[in-house]
Amino acid sequence: NSSDSTDHYKKYLDAGADYIILGEGELTLKELLTKIKNKESASDLKGIVFKNNEEFVTNPKREALKNLDELPMPAWDLVDVDAYKKVWAERGKKISLNIATTRGCPYKCNWCAKPIYGVRYNSHSPEYITKLISYLKENYDVTNFWMCDDIFGLKPRWVQNFNTALKKADLKISYVIQSRVDLLLKEDSIDALAESGLKEVWVGAESGSQKILDAMDKGTQLSQIYEATRLLKVKNVKVAFFIQFGYLGETKEDIAKTIAMIKELQPDDIGVSVSYPLPGTKFYEMVKDDLNLKSNWRDSDDLAMMFQGTFNSNYYKKLHRYVHKEYRKSQAITNFKHIIKKPSLISISKLRSMLLYFYYTPSAILDKFALDKMENSNK
């Protein structure tokens, strides 16, 4: 059961799998295991696909769960949490555990993975999640969490109610989320998130070009990226950007705008990738004729273009390094300015950042020269 096996169930069955569970797995898996245990036929079970001799049999889909609170609490007692704690401690860090508060995403970015849960959005209640956090704190002394939702707190007033529930339970936690800049700007969301313990938020900034954002069907504005970043920093919440290069129609001018945005807004971290055509997406349909024999992740390596973009894979690999160096340079300059104004702000990390400026500067110049050469040879 996975998004990949749901999309490519024939390959999994041909490789020897007995059954593939399509979509959500909890109810179907429970019923399937019961039938196997009782040596009963599963041929009429909703939500599975299997082979009958050489024929693929796809049963009707199972209706998606709407009230996630009906599910029992995750069986953390089956996990050796102490072993994970030890690994984190060896790296000088406190353990962080993953929690899923929602399923699905109602937005329609045309390049995004077709979610296993469909274009919908169901969530646990703030009270359920607070109860789970309380259990993890009491039993494993865990207070750091990664909320692994595609979109955290989309429902109106969810984050505000979550903040209230945590206060009522006297829980002080630190957590990281993924969100959208337009969602963060609604009502008093950032205030409630900061009060409840939000440490860092990863947002899909994607591009500094409004033209590219519109082409992606992203549904966000550059002005929202700027405003959300500003407000998060005011609340001392770290903000990190997902950045995507290589989308159809992207020019070197669009790339320059993205780099300029990163340097100006100074996110606390960045994750850089190239546009990737996942089967089941609108973007895949747009570029599938260029893929030839390539298909999905098996034919792609790090930052490799699978379709004919404006530039080739070598360009984007070099661009990845260049963007990170320019980003680190701009961080060093900012740290230097802050320390000049207020020397008490100096720290080992800031000092290291400033010293690395002298490494990144000549290296970035060489990368820029190589990129310019690649751009000219591409004309």
Where are each of the predicted segments found?
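Catalytic cores of alpha/beta
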Residues: 8-14, 249-264
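Radical SAM enzyme core and accessory elements
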Residues: 105, 282-288, 294-296, 300-379
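Flexible glycine/acidic-rich beta-alpha junction loops that bind and position SAM and/or redox cofactors
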Residues: 4-9, 53, 107, 157, ...
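Mobile, glycine-enriched helix-loop/loop "lid" segments at the mouths of ligand-binding/catalytic clefts
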Residues: 62-81, 285-303
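Radical SAM [4Fe-4S] cluster-binding motif and immediate context
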Residues: 74-247, 260
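Short, hinge-like loop/turn segments at secondary-structure boundaries
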Residues: 14-17, 37-40, 192-193, 219-220, ...
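Glycine-rich beta-alpha loop elements in corrinoid/cobalamin-binding modules
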Residues: 1-65, 274-280
